[in-house]
């Protein structure tokens, strides 16, 4: 994966069901702190069992999730998120994610996740 200099945009993040409830100003602040990354087809973004230190939003492309014990688990498309389980529960990655097509993801570190995203789980 190669990080780009640009951050995600609030509009791109607003397509995520998880993040869509954030006010526009908050979404814009989160977008500024996220890093946009190009992911070539076939490349792994995260691997099951690794330490989870980033949260991801799919901006374009299709990615597949797999678990060693269960095999393929599903597809991720624009607006979908991953990485939140490892960060929210402080556990190793529970699945691997690999790009099926060229993809773009936006990601943030644990501190940004804790500030902007973790509170959304308390609302459920």
Where does each model-flagged region fall?
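Cytosolic regulatory regions built on CNB/CRP/Popeye-like sensor folds
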Residues: 1-124
């Amino acid at each position: 994966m190669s990080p780009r200099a640009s951050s995600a945009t609030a509009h791109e993040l607003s397509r995520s069901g998880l993040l869509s409830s954030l006010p526009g100003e908050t979404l814009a602040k989160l977008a500024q702190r996220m890093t946009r990354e190009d992911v070539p087809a076939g490349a792994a973004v995260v691997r099951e069992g690794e330490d989870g230190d980033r949260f991801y939003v799919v901006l374009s492309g299709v990615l597949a999730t797999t678990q060693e014990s269960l095999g393929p688990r599903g597809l991720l498309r624009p607006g979908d998120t991953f990485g939140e389980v490892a960060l929210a529960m402080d556990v190793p990655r529970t699945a691997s994610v690999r790009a099926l097509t060229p993809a773009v993801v936006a990601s943030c570190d644990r501190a940004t996740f804790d500030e902007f995203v973790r509170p959304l789980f308390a609302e459920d």
